[in-house]
Amino acid sequence: MVHAAVADLAKHLGPERVLTGERIPPRYRLDALRAHRGTRLPVAGVRPAAVVVPRSPHDVSSVVRFAREAGFNVVPWGGGTGLMGGARPRDDSIVLDLRRMHRVRSIDRASCTAIAEAGIVLEGLDRRLRRRGLSLGHDPWSRPRATLGGAIGTNGLGYAGYLRGSMGDQVLGLEVVLADGTILRTRAAARSTTGLDLKRLFIGTEGTLGIVTAATIRAFPIPEREDVRSFEIPDFTTGFTAVSRIYDDGLVPSVMELDESFPAPALPWSSDEGPPTLHLGFAGKREVVGASWRGANARLRRSRAKRLPAREARAFWRRRHAIIYHHDEVAPGVTSADRLLANTIFDYAHVALPRSKVLAFRRSALSIVRRHRVAPIGFGTWTQPELVSLEMVRPVRADREEAREAVADAIDEVLRRALALGGSIEYVHGVGVKLTHLLAEELGEGLDLARKVKRALDPAGTLNPGKAGF
């Protein structure tokens, strides 16, 4: 019965755009939540019922209507770079690979806006904008592979997050296919106070309330000057205090990353303990950048920061996207990261905290991780002092599941500590399926309200079930 239904879909859209059975490549079983991560979820993934390649919002609408009537669910797919399992299918899923919907429909240079389809890769969109003297404000580590739709679905954050905001902050209007197949287009005004801001329903909800097919986004004039510098800091507390003062002074960095590293002999690459490193940058008019650096340098001198050679800053900036290439396939369904971390469980926490709680969280989090016999390998703040990341690793010796469980337990306790300090369990990647079990602890009664919204918009549960708490 299922196969007959999918066959009908293939007749409607064309067999070359509907993949089933052995024709479905293994990559559609998983996104970037894989076997080397600290998760209690099944790590093998399952083959979906079908993969469909739409070319228009009307194609998406047809597939959603079909899925709802035939009892399938629909999982949107972009670059496959999601770290939380937001694009994981079930065996009754129709995966919508949106990458053929990659047009830039228009660029308005005077208004500094663009309309682009959800499947366009962020780096390609940035290149198109730069031909018109504009740039994309969203610059995550995954930019060479991630798509616009995925960035909107997770409300992702990039290196310029403090200067430009999250991806959702840059969205003016959306084209969305709802669970009944309706194509909704929200007005792309710079500001409106005419009631509910409908586009916000679909930003950060991971395709569970509607499937984004296109967006009107802000674009930004290419800055006259971009100046990124790197510093060695005596210790993390000193660096954190200096960075906080820079923000208190009203300066607006275009990039900020304060990192400390810990030795991790289990990793297949070197990780040496040493003084924390601060990468800091400003962008804009030359005189504004110069004035910003004069203010920042005054704070850094008081903190005994040592400026590193310019090549260090250039290397940092050049390598900022390098990690994404570990997610490239080296064999069907196998990525470079799968092989690199074959004997290791690796994971991270990305939490938002009140600034006054960051140093207390650091002490607690490092203690928690070590108590679980997991090694912290990095701790830092990114884009602004309140956004904190912690990386950890545990080698696989005899029992891989034991190692994965230890890392998962450490992550959960660290995230609960962030909640106890008034923070949020995730600030950049969404929750997907990986963190859904903690949503009730963060949202409280708000989760019940969110689920009422889900039932109102998608009573059959057609759109990306099991993600984002739904």
Regions found by a protein language model. Give the residues of each.
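Activity-critical C-terminal alpha-helical subdomain
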Residues: 182, 432-470
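FAD-binding subdomain of flavoenzyme oxidoreductases
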Residues: 103-257, 462-463
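Glycine-rich N-terminal segment of FAD-binding domains in flavoprotein oxidoreductases
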Residues: 21-101, 116, 136
